[in-house]
């Protein structure tokens, strides 16, 4: 397909609608999806079909014929493509040559067909027999003098069964080194919520959206990241719910939505207004904004109490279910409005407006994405939002609750079944008892710690169950240095990506079945299970013929790695690879909530795993929900850098384009933001562009400001005048990941602060002609 001409052109249509249908058709053609595989779309997110390999948004219990979205089609088309990367492809391309290609070009080559090993003499990947590949892995692992010298990464696309077997193998091997994609996204949620409500998961289901009268949407862009959420928001808006979007960018999907599932809306050119109100904090201003809302709620309650009016606070809930409220209220009363306004970037009148909306709501849901979780203070921010919801009893009742919207399709499920570098003692005891071994007790490495350990020479083997580790991570040049220092890198994957080219001394690419493909073991079709963002667990069966006869399932690959490394004295690995129900039996024995796992999966749509805080059961030291007190931070890296550089210091947030999913680049457009045929763009306020002495359309280089003496720069970005708060910038990752310092992480969660990068701009040394 011809590369489009780069251009900037405002998009005037609603999200989805005919534009989405056009792009669906173009993607199916671009991926050369065969006629038979087109039918796969009608099995997407259906009870007897497969779970979308894209986002973690839940499926409706009563599914329609079309339970897919534009980005889901992109994911399925990419997996169902007829294009193949065979051994012959690598005969024609060295690794050095492939490194010169863009991430988009690498994605477009198609599905991998055979296991491959790196041949250093020829700088090529060459075929290897499966048995030899597993023997190489077992040899490397068994030669290490300490199991903690290996790290085992997991992508959120791995199924519950694959993830559970993986963690069992790794813990029997002897380490808790489980860097996971969740370390880079919603870790602040997983670490923050247990401190307040006891469980690091959301408390709502889709049913609650049917009863909510107020929705607060923090730091997310559903039209791109989880488009099916727009269907729920549309229904909420149609019945009169108040929807408030709290985001630095005024995203198109938060403005208007034309539903492809509603013919009248499509045929008449109509659309539905989604947001009633927009609140635009500066990047990183959410904590101060939420604190301002909570302070106003206290003021409203104080006034009501003084005048003998009904209380604004849910006094009964606070008294029965919480501790710590008095200290929290005292802190709010003492907080300065000047500090709240300055640090949030939101005028006081808008903070009061948001507080009034919240106080009037009888059933409030708060949702959030990575706009809340990739800052230095994200754990306190999540906990403060939890505090706000507890003030009016908006947790554990119909139509109300906490709704973190996670990214990849099974990122939550992987954590549930044991992909956790900091496992609880109770989990390890149950795992050891069921499988008759002593699991390692010492906490392992997360993503950033794994990279630091590689750079320090402590990690020598890296195995990745899916993902694109070398591109998804921060501080790109240092990550590449770290990966190249390994003795062995292994990637279990469906398609070629950059991480396969950033390899260790020995390197393997192990191709696996995709979610859309039939998984036959001993003549029996196997299903795998996943857990969505609202704790619903359901079965997924592939429908397409495998892309190659030489593919193995993720579970088979994990089982055979384990067999080659550990033998079968404790676990019959191959039996588990032949019958996934055996793995689910193990999950049932080890993890509470999975009772009668195999039977419950037979119910159309699966089952709800159960979240204690949804039932107002608080798994905290006090046995109650806990109000926690946090102050506004005035000494962050952004503050310190601005003290030195003044108003020239900008705060950069990384974001996705509409044509990508995580690090997978499906195309070069971001049409809702008016960007076409290019990715190296930098969104900036027109007044900032002028203040800095630039012009829109000019190329600039971006340098991050950090205190470790390392120069971090990303060159030749096109300045685009955009509706974004002063002092704030936006650009796509992974192009801007080199700007994120490895040591810049969320306190208490270790997440790279990819939404809070202090940067300076200068005119680009690369001409516009060269950049194009």
Features from the language model and the residues they span:
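Long, structured ligand/cofactor-binding scaffold of large enzymes
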Residues: 125-214
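Short cysteine/histidine-rich metal-coordination sites, predominantly Zn2+-binding motifs
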Residues: 67-78
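Long, low-complexity segments enriched in small/aliphatic residues
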Residues: 576-671
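Low-complexity, highly charged intrinsically disordered N-terminal segments
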Residues: 77-124
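Non-catalytic alpha/beta scaffold blocks inside enzyme catalytic domains
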Residues: 116, 187-387, 391-397, 405-588, ...
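Intrinsically disordered, low-structural-confidence terminal and linker regions
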Residues: 1-49
């Amino acid at each position: 397909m011809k590369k489009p001409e780069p251009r900037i052109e405002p998009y005037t249509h609603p999200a989805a609608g005919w534009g989405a249908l056009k792009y669906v058709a173009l993607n199916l053609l671009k991926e050369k999806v065969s006629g038979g595989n087109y039918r796969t779309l009608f099995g997407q997110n259906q009870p007897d079909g497969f779970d979308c390999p894209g986002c973690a948004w839940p499926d409706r219990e009563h599914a329609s014929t079309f339970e897919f979205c534009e980005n889901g089609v992109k994911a399925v088309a990419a997996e169902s493509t007829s294009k193949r990367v065979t051994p012959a492809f690598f005969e024609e391309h060295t690794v050095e040559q492939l490194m010169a290609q863009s991430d988009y070009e690498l994605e477009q080559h198609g599905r991998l067909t055979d296991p491959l090993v790196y041949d250093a003499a020829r700088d090529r990947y060459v075929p290897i027999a499966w048995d030899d590949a597993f023997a190489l892995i077992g040899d490397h692992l068994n030669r290490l003098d300490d199991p903690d010298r290996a790290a085992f990464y997991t992508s959120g696309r791995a199924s519950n069964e694959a993830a559970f077997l993986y963690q069992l193998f790794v813990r029997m091997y002897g380490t808790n080194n489980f860097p996971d994609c969740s370390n880079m996204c919603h870790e602040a949620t997983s670490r923050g919520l247990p401190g307040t409500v006891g469980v690091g998961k959301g408390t709502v289901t889709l049913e609650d959206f049917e009863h909510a009268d107020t929705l607060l949407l923090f730091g997310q862009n559903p039209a791109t990241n989880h488009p099916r959420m727009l269907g729920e928001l549309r229904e909420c808006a149609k019945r009169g719910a108040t929807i408030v979007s709290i985001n630095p960018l005024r995203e198109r999907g938060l403005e208007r939505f034309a539903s492809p599932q509603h013919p009248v809306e499509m045929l008449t050119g109509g659309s539905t207004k989604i947001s009633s109100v927009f609140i635009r904090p500066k990047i990183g201003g959410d904590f101060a904004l939420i604190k301002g809302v909570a302070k106003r709620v206290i003021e409203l309650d104080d006034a009501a109490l003084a005048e003998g009016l009904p209380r604004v606070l849910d006094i009964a809930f606070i008294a029965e279910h919480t501790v710590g409220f008095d200290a929290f209220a005292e802190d709010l009363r003492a907080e300065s409005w000047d500090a709240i306004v300055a640090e949030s970037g939101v005028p006081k009148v808008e903070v009061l407006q948001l507080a009034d909306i919240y106080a009037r709501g009888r059933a409030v849901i708060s949702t959030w994405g990575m706009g809340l979780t990739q800052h230095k203070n994200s754990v306190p921010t999540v906990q403060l939002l939890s505090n706000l919801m507890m003030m009016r009893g908006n947790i554990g009742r119909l139509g109300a609750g906490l709704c973190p919207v996670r990214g990849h399709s099974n990122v939550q499920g992987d954590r549930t079944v044991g992909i956790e570098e900091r496992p609880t003692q109770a989990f390890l005891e149950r795992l050891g008892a069921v499988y008759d071994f002593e699991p390692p007790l010492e906490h392992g490495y997360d993503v950033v710690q794994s990279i630091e350990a590689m750079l320090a020479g402590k990690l020598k083997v890296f195995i990745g169950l899916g993902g694109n580790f070398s591109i998804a991570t921060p501080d790109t040049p240092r990550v590449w240095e770290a990966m190249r220092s390994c003795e062995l890198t292994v990637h279990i994957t469906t398609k070629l990506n950059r991480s396969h080219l950033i390899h260790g001394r020995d390197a393997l690419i192990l191709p696996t079945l995709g979610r859309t493909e039939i998984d036959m073991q001993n003549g029996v079709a196997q299903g795998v299970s996943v857990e969505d963002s609202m704790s619903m667990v359901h079965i997924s069966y592939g429908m397409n013929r495998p892309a190659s006869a030489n593919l193995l399932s993720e579970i088979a690959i994990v089982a055979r790695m384990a067999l080659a490394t550990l033998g079968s004295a404790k676990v019959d690995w191959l039996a588990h690879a032949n019958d996934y129900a055996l793995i689910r039996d193990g999950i049932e024995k080890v993890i509470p909530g999975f009772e009668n796992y195999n039977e419950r999966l037979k119910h159309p749509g699966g089952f709800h795993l159960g979240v204690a805080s949804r039932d107002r059961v608080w798994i905290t030291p006090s046995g109650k929900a806990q109000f926690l007190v946090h102050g506004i931070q005035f000494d962050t890296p952004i503050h310190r850098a601005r003290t030195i550089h003044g108003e020239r210091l900008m705060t950069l947030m990384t974001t996705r384009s509409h044509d990508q999913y995580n690090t997978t680049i499906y195309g070069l457009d971001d049409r809702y933001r008016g960007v076409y045929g290019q990715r190296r763009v930098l969104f900036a306020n027109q007044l900032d562009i002028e203040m800095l002495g630039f012009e829109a359309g000019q190329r600039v280089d971006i340098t991050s400001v950090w205190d470790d003496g390392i120069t971090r720069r990303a060159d030749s970005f096109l300045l685009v005048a955009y509706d974004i708060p002063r002092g704030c910038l936006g650009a796509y990752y992974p192009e801007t990941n080199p700007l994120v310092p490895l040591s810049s992480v969320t306190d208490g969660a270790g997440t790279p602060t990819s939404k809070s990068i202090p940067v300076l701009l200068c005119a680009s040394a690369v001409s516009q002609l060269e950049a194009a």
